[in-house]
């Protein structure tokens, strides 16, 4: 009962679980996840909320993994809980994308959580991180190099992700389960030194406890709490410096001191769980002061990009290659062009709000509108006599270089009339069949 009081206390402090919540729980069948669900079931006597379990078989441990999967299914059945199970070939994916098993496992895990989250209409994801995980994460980040924000450990509440047992030690969890004869599975890889975190758990912490201080973990957790309080008191409000697309607005931070800028950058990266050291923060700070569009790799998955007005994080993808592809849209029609859905509709009501993603064109019924990417020498008309190279338009408009080859360009009668999201051109009047001209509304929606 003492442990449950700790859970209640933590829940009250951080508002982790409330009435009418729908919670997706990561369930491995191990002691931590079993203990988490047992505590959540007890919390249902105090709050009205739903629980759904998610189990992932990473196909790394053969029969052991299958045994865990079967146990998870039976546990859910016994406790009248709905469970979603998925098998993911983590080793094959890691080899294909050039990432570690841990990285791929984490990415695929949260990807599946998100899928189930949408399916059941959840508003929270609960993970079974315990107090030992907090301490191991602190040491792992300290060894690799990180910021003060990184040394906070694993956040108890991070947007929609909650960790209700994150202040309970593993030994107390095991003692509770064994005392109450609650079954669980043991992942044998937790006792192997193949993964860095396992090595910290199995070697480093026991060595320090035995040689220097038996209460080492308590001391580290006290330090984590102190760092959290310090960060909370000193941290800037990130939302004051970012736009609706979560990009840092450079104009708003130019008068901040270097100290505040670096703190802001740490907060900015930490929200995506990107771990970087002090040198990388210094490098990004120098990037902010430079001219033009530049970027820096953060890790295997992300890079940070500075353009003329913003600083933002982007996911690394395969290099984008321009293809000589032309999509021809008959008036009226609708078609997908890579990451864009393009609709061409005839309109009679001319009182249409002007939107950035729309173009109102005079054209002939059944004529063709072409869509493609830019080509060498492309020009756009500014008025009846003057045109300009699209390359120069991009420079004038300060369009980032990596975006210039991704913007759809629209042509009618072989003349460019619109660079999507950048510039609308002057269109000469059509002399022939002018009486048959109709109003055509072109709408572009990004579907990626």
UniProtKB/Swiss-Prot annotation:
It catalyses: cytidine(34) in tRNA(Ile2) + L-lysine + ATP = lysidine(34) in tRNA(Ile2) + AMP + diphosphate + H(+). ATP binds at residues 28-33. GO terms for cellular component: cytoplasm. Keywords: ATP-binding, Cytoplasm, Ligase, Nucleotide-binding, tRNA processing. It is found in: Cytoplasm. One of its GO terms (biological process) is tRNA modification. Signal peptide: none annotated. GO terms for molecular function: ATP binding; tRNA(Ile)-lysidine synthase activity. Its EC number is 6.3.4.19. InterPro entries: Lysidine-tRNA-synth_C, Rossmann-like_a/b/a_fold, TilS/TtcA_N, tRNA_Ile_lys_synt, tRNA_Ile_lys_synt_N. It is an enzyme of class 6 (ligase). It holds the Pfam family TilS_C. Belongs to the tRNA(Ile)-lysidine synthase family. Ligates lysine onto the cytidine present at position 34 of the AUA codon-specific tRNA(Ile) that contains the anticodon CAU, in an ATP-dependent manner. Cytidine is converted to lysidine, thus changing the amino acid specificity of the tRNA from methionine to isoleucine. The N-terminal region contains the highly conserved SGGXDS motif, predicted to be a P-loop motif involved in ATP binding. This is tRNA(Ile)-lysidine synthase. The lineage of its organism: Bacteria, Fusobacteriati, Fusobacteriota, Fusobacteriia, Fusobacteriales. The gene is tilS.
């Amino acid at each position: 009962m003492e442990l449950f009081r700790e859970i209640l206390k933590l829940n009250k402090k951080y508002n982790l679980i409330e009435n009418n919540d729908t919670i997706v729980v990561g369930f491995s069948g191990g002691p931590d996840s079993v203990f988490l669900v047992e505590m959540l079931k007890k919390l249902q006597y105090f709050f009205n909320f739903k629980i759904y379990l998610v189990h992932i078989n990473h196909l790394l441990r053969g029969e052991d993994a299958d045994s865990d999967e079967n146990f998870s299914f039976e546990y859910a059945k016994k406790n009248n809980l709905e469970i979603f199970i998925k098998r993911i070939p983590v080793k094959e994916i890691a080899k294909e994308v050039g990432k570690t098993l841990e990285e791929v496992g984490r990415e695929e895990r949260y990807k599946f959580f998100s899928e189930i989250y949408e399916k059941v209409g959840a508003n929270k994801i609960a993970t079974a991180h315990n107090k030992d995980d907090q301490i191991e994460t602190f040491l792992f980040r300290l060894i690799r190099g990180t910021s003060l924000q990184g040394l906070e450990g694993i956040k108890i509440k991070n947007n929609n992700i909650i960790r209700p047992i994150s202040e309970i030690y593993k030994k107390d969890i095991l003692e509770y389960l064994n005392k109450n004869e609650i079954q669980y599975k043991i992942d044998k890889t937790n006792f192997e030194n193949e993964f860095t975190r396992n090595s910290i758990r199995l070697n480093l912490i026991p060595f320090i406890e035995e040689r220097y201080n038996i209460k080492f973990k308590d001391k580290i957790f006290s330090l984590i709490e102190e760092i959290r309080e310090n960060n909370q008191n000193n941290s800037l409000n990130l939302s004051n410096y970012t736009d609706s697309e979560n990009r840092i607005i450079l104009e708003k931070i130019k008068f901040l001191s270097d100290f505040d800028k670096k703190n802001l950058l740490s907060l900015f990266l930490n929200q995506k769980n990107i771990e970087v050291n002090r040198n990388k923060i210094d490098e990004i700070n120098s990037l902010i002061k430079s001219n033009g569009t530049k970027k820096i790799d953060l890790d295997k998955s992300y890079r940070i990009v500075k353009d003329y007005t913003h600083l933002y994080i982007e996911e690394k993808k395969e290099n984008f290659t321009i293809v000589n592809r032309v999509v021809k849209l008959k008036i009226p029609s609708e078609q997908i062009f890579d990451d864009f859905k393009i609709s061409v509709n005839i309109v009679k009501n001319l009182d249409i709000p002007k939107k950035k993603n729309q173009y109102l064109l005079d054209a002939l019924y059944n004529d063709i509108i072409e869509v493609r990417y830019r080509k060498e020498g492309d020009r756009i008309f500014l008025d009846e006599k003057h045109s300009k190279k699209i390359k120069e338009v991009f420079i004038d408009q300060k369009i980032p270089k990596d975006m210039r080859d991704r913007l759809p360009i629209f042509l009618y009668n072989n003349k460019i009339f619109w660079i999507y999201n950048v510039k609308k051109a002057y269109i000469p009047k059509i002399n022939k069949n002018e009486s048959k001209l109709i109003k055509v509304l072109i709408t572009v929606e990004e579907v990626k």
